[in-house]
Amino acid sequence: MKCPYCGYPDSKVIDSRPTDDNTSIRRRRECLKCGKRFTTYEKVEQLPILVIKKDNRREVYDRDKILKGMIKACEKRPVPIKVLEEITDEIDKRIINSMEREITSTEIGEMVMEKLKNVDEVAYVRFASVYRQFKDINTFMDELKKLLKENETKKEKT
């Protein structure tokens, strides 16, 4: 590491420890030429993740869009914001941990629907109707029938 005081290109690490939030490493260094000490921080580089939209446009991934979409689907429903924030965190971690640089909006939408289905079925249907762009009442009814069939299957298993 280059010394900020004299510009010498080499230093030694005297102390190394994680920061309080465990997102970076704090290192105390000493210049091998002038002997002055300085602090550096080492952090994982977060490369942007791109979302491939249905029309093949690409835009930078924004976790807030997931939360806003679920809030809209849960409007006037008894779903606490904390639950939606937790779902958003889970989906966000899943996307980031996949280590993929690109993800389709379809994949994100499916993750959201999978989570919403277990939280509030009305919110799930609302989200699905926008996300899947239901063209008419029959498409809407088909989704409701699938949901009802899944519920019956769950009841039979218990």
Curated annotation (Swiss-Prot):
MF term (GO), any: zinc ion binding
What ranges of residues constitute the unnamed zinc fingers? Answer: 3-34
| GO BP annotations, alphabetical order | negative regulation of DNA-templated transcription
Task: Name the family.
Answer: Belongs to the NrdR family.
Q: Does the keyword Transcription regulation apply?
A: yes
Where does the ATP-cone domain lie?
49-139
One Pfam assignment: ATP-cone
The record ties this protein, via InterPro entries, to: ATP-cone_dom, NrdR-like_N, RNR_NrdR-like
Q: What does this protein do?
A: Negatively regulates transcription of bacterial ribonucleotide reductase nrd genes and operons by binding to NrdR-boxes.
Keywords per UniProt:
ATP-binding, DNA-binding, Metal-binding, Nucleotide-binding, Repressor, Transcription, Transcription regulation, Zinc, Zinc-finger
Gene source species: Thermoanaerobacter pseudethanolicus (strain ATCC 33223 / 39E)
- Cofactors (names): Zn(2+)
Kindly indicate whether the keyword Nucleotide-binding belongs to this entry: yes
Query: Protein name, please?
Result: Transcriptional repressor NrdR
Q: From which residue to which does any coiled coil extend? A: none
